Every structure is written in C-alpha cells, then in structure tokens.
C-alpha cells in the first residue's frame, strides 16, 4: 500500500450472542466507554469518544458458536496511561494472566464469546513478563474508564498463512494485522454465520478509492457510487472497510 493509504485507526467489529454480558466485559474488565447503542450494534471507545471497537448482537437464529479455533486469535489494546491498567485490575474482574512491563502492568482477558484481549501500555508488548504471583491492586473509586487507547494489533487464525499473506500483500505493513496458522472448520465460515470477527474498519490518512481499487484488483470489492468507502472481503470471509479518516 502506498504512503497515501497509511492507516490512522482500525476498528474491529465482533458478532456476539448476548449484548448485556459482553457490554459488562468490555466496559468493566477492559475499561471501554459505551458511546452509542443503535439497533443490534454498540460502538465502544474511550473518554475522547473515539470509536475503537464495535459489537453486534446476532441471535442464535442467525449465528452460532464457533466450532474449534475462532478467526480472531487476539486483539492487542495499547493504553495511553499505564496507571489506568492498575485501576482496571483493582476492580477485581477475572483475567487470564497478569504481566509486568517497564511502564507498568498488563493483562490478558477473555470475553464471554471467547475473544482474547491483551491490554498493555508498553512500547513493545513482547517485553512483557508473565507474573506467577499476582499483586493486590487497590480499588480506585474515581476511575471511570480508559482515557485513551487504540487497537494496536489484530491477530487472525488462518488455515494457510502464506495464502493469507498473499491476499494482504498489497497493503504492505500498513495494516495492524498478523496471522497465526491453525486448523478449524469455521476459519472460512460465512461472515455472519458465527460469533466471531466479522469486519475491520480502517480509517486512512488519505483515501483515494480509485487508487485503492486498482491496488486490490482481482479481489472481491464493492465501491458505492458516492465513492465514500471501499469494502473488500478476504479469504476468511472477513469484511475490510476502508474510508477517509
């Protein structure tokens, strides 16, 4: 992808079964703010009111639980203020693992749908060290959620890593996506068939829809007459939405 198409923001869209249970997890465990509820969708973000993640409730009549590994392996969240992670841990919500980094603590948590999130504030999350003994974190009554964070990385489980890399090759290293090779019957399931990652919305620094469409020639694309966005679908049936930041 050219310099004109640098990603400013990535917003994952996740299909969920129970909106209430998932909202409790995203707001209480991860510290997100409920920005807007509209229809089956909920827009989540931080205190700057910038959308960072969307959940869409999809009843069992339309979607089902994933069999085997999910398409979404992990979402990594980068927090601006390290001390706010301690505030989240002080709320005594269940987490999978707590880590120590140079700037402070980090943790990994699992949503009611089985989606894994790593929350940290480090320059490099690879430097995090898993803690065997978890310290006691004080409750911070004044804490009302994360001031600012962004989606740093989305890790996808794919049946063939080289095939996935070939599809995404035109984007270069401008998209915050990594791949992990796995085996699973639902890794190529239809987009709305399972409670899984259904879309990633990308806001681009400069959005030239004709140039982007040419770059992605031969792929499944949709561009409206207004040319305000471009919608592509990757080999895992995950929708990729591109628009001007």
Question: Whereabouts are the PLM-identified features?
Answer:
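N-terminal beta-strand motif that seeds the catalytic metal site of vicinal oxygen chelate
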Residues: 1-20, 75, 126-165, 197-200
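Hydrophobic, helix-prone linear segments
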Residues: 1-50
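Short, conserved charged micro-motifs
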Residues: 21-23, 82-87, 162-166, 207-213
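Conserved active-site tyrosine of GNAT-family acetyltransferases
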Residues: 22-27, 114, 164-169, 237
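Short amphipathic alpha-helices in soluble, non-transmembrane regions
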Residues: 25-29, 88-93, 212-219
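Conserved short beta-strand elements that form part of the metal-binding/catalytic scaffold
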Residues: 33-69, 116-124, 169-206, 226, ...
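Extreme N-terminal leader/targeting regions
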Residues: 71-97
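Vicinal oxygen chelate
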Residues: 93-150, 174-181, 188, 214-245
């Amino acid at each position: 992808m050219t310099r004109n198409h640098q990603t400013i923001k990535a917003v994952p869209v996740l299909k969920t079964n129970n909106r209430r249970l998932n909202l409790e997890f995203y707001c209480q465990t991860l510290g997100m703010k409920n920005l807007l509820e509209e229809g089956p969708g909920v827009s989540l973000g931080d205190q700057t009111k910038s959308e960072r993640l969307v959940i869409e409730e999809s009843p069992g009549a339309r979607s089902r639980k994933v069999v085997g590994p999910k398409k979404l392996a992990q979402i990594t969240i980068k927090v601006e203020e390290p001390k706010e992670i301690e505030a989240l841990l002080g709320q005594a919500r269940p987490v999978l693992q707590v880590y120590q980094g140079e700037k402070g603590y980090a943790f990994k948590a699992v949503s009611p749908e089985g989606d894994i999130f790593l929350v940290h504030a480090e320059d490099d999350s690879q430097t995090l060290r898993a803690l065997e003994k978890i310290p006691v974190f004080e409750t911070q009554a004044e804490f009302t959620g994360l001031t600012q964070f962004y989606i740093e990385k989305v890790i996808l489980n794919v049946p063939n890593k080289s095939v996935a890399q070939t599809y995404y090759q035109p984007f270069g290293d401008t998209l915050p996506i990594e791949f992990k090779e796995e085996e699973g019957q639902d890794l190529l399931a239809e987009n709305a068939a399972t409670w899984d990652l259904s879309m990633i919305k990308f806001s681009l620094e400069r959005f030239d829809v004709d140039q982007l469409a040419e770059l992605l020639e031969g792929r499944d694309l949709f561009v409206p007459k207004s040319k305000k966005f471009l919608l592509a679908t990757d080999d895992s049936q995950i929708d990729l939405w591109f628009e001007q930041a």
